[in-house]
From Swiss-Prot:
GO cellular component: cytoplasm
Disulphide connectivity of cysteines: none
Pfam families: SecB (PF02556)
NCBIfam families with a match to the protein in the record: PRK05751.1-3 (NF004392), secB (TIGR00809)
Lineage per the UniProt record: Bacteria, Pseudomonadati, Pseudomonadota, Alphaproteobacteria, Hyphomicrobiales
Gene3D superfamilies in UniProt: SecB-like
Name this polypeptide is given: Protein-export protein SecB
Amino acid sequence: MTNGNGTPPEAAPPPQLNVLAQYTKDLSFENPNAPASLAPQPQQPAINIQINVGAKALAENEYEVTLSIEGKAEGASSLIFSFELQYAGVFRIVNVPQENLHPLVMIECPRLLFPFAREIIATAVRDGGFPPLMLDPVDFVGLYRQNMDRQAAEAQQASPN
């Protein structure tokens, strides 16, 4: 295929995703029942983890993506520990079609941030006197789909029939 004058058309520039910065926006660790909570527990604590992703445009082609992770460990009768982390990154994204931009920001950017957030949480829990909490990998595609389905259902409920 040619561009009309016998030369092949120039290839479109490749998509680019650059991490410009990564940082902890907020970190909280609570061990409200220490030192009693540090004693051996009769059973494994119930651990509950909540993960959310937020994003906002900062400038043309630049986005701040925040990975929010909250968790708590509870024993039979009390809270053992809890934590909250907001870990963010600034990303420059160029040459990406508009229809692919939202999934890229909400799936790939948090996937790049997650290992760093996981390490911060493991260290905070360890420094709180417990074995490090190693979070399992997160299916950000599944999380994205779940959030999109929830938003679609909310929009459908809000619109009159």
